[in-house]
């Protein structure tokens, strides 16, 4: 039957979607000499110089001992080292490592990442946090929501004065920087600037649904670079980038400069993901100054916070081809959550709403399937009679459909319309940080064992995937069997294949699919009872 072929196509499409990164990895780029986030000199390219501001004078500079500056806000606690302005800690107050109440806060800059000098600036191949004398203005900052505070750092390297003004906000995860280079020498300077971030792995190494990856965004859109082996060799996209980041489905650490003509590169070294954006040909005339505005984002991938950053940082939430479907579904999910206060229940309500919207189409599909079921004996006879003449068999089948006024695609079209909705919801749930550590049923009934306490994690006891497989099997039994024996055998194994595939799915996705199956069974059963 035609509708069976579509069911099979949907199932295989899901398998391709889930295993896309494994089946079709991005084309491997050959490593380039400058691919690694390194500290090597490279020839600078000239570009038209902007009108120069007055240089910071050497007389105004006086080195001070390095110190650790703590910035405390309602959203995070950060520790900045005044020697070069590198981060040593960035703990998110609203997010913990696990679901346990006493679990440590998510710290985007741990000891491993700290060793790679996140937010450090490399000037002409020289790390400024190592080879520059620094002074600092200001101390610890305690910021309330709506407030902002600035740390001013200045460094001297020969005739050059480097100045970093880092502004922290109490209600965003963005660090705004005003960077300047002053030339007190007698000749113009051409510089190469590297802006860097470094972060430890943001997700488990074996989590294929939530990988830690390098991300770059430019005129051609989002460029994702994943795979430890590939990143260990270093990657360097050829096109200019507007921002670069290390991210998972839920968190992002990135650089968003005001200029949009920087070159990106990324490397995995010593278990730490490093991303840099290079600015070539930064000219500073004699006695002049060159300025650059930069934004750094360190935080959760929540749209309202990402939208505060320039250059479409919100594009880091990548729903793929079904973006136009996923976004409204996420809004509906949040709408239901605002009323029920439980994302598991919100997923169920959203699933019911989707089924109600497509109810008329589903009814039409079931009706068409029933008509096709009645024709199965006649179709079987035609297949047997014209098994050696496929063209004649198809002609006779079309005549049979015409005689009984049956559209063989009638059961397929309603299902095809629903495919974008399913894939859109799949992507929406997979990339929604709201489901991270969001509980549905905290404990297994009648026990103290934790169950479905985190909708972004798999079912620890595999109960929901097994029930989901059983519902698929039941639904299959309620559907007319295909006339093609090979197709029938494939369909017989689909519940088993789906069950194994869903074993490691985030439980929120399994809940959606399970509820969808249960409603479909109820709808089909209602149709059968109505007919009888």
UniProtKB/Swiss-Prot annotation:
Q: What GO molecular function annotations does the UniProt record carry, in alphabetical order?
A: membrane insertase activity
**InterPro entries per record:** Membr_insert_YidC, Membr_insert_YidC_N, YidC/ALB3/OXA1/COX18, YidC/Oxa/ALB_C, YidC_ALB_C, YidC_periplasmic_sf
Q: Which gene encodes it?
A: yidC
Q: Which BP terms from GO are recorded?
A: protein insertion into membrane; protein transport
State whether keyword Transmembrane applies. yes
Gene3D superfamilies linked: 2.70.98.90
What biological function has been recorded for the protein in this entry? Required for the insertion and/or proper folding and/or complex formation of integral membrane proteins into the membrane. Involved in integration of membrane proteins that insert both dependently and independently of the Sec translocase complex, as well as at least some lipoproteins. Aids folding of multispanning membrane proteins.
Descriptive protein name: Membrane protein insertase YidC
In the record, the note on similarity to other proteins reads:
Belongs to the OXA1/ALB3/YidC family. Type 1 subfamily.
Of the GO CC terms on this record, one is: plasma membrane
Species source reads Solidesulfovibrio magneticus (strain ATCC 700980 / DSM 13731 / RS-1)
- State the oligomer form and interacting partners: Interacts with the Sec translocase complex via SecD. Specifically interacts with transmembrane segments of nascent integral membrane proteins during membrane integration.
**Compartment(s) where it occurs, according to its Swiss-Prot or TrEMBL record:** Cell inner membrane
Membrane topology, record value: Multi-pass membrane protein
NCBIfam families, per this entry? PRK01318.1-4, yidC_nterm, yidC_oxa1_cterm
Keyword annotations from UniProtKB, A to Z: Cell inner membrane, Cell membrane, Chaperone, Membrane, Protein transport, Transmembrane, Transmembrane helix, Transport
Transmembrane regions: 6-26, 339-359, 410-430, 490-510
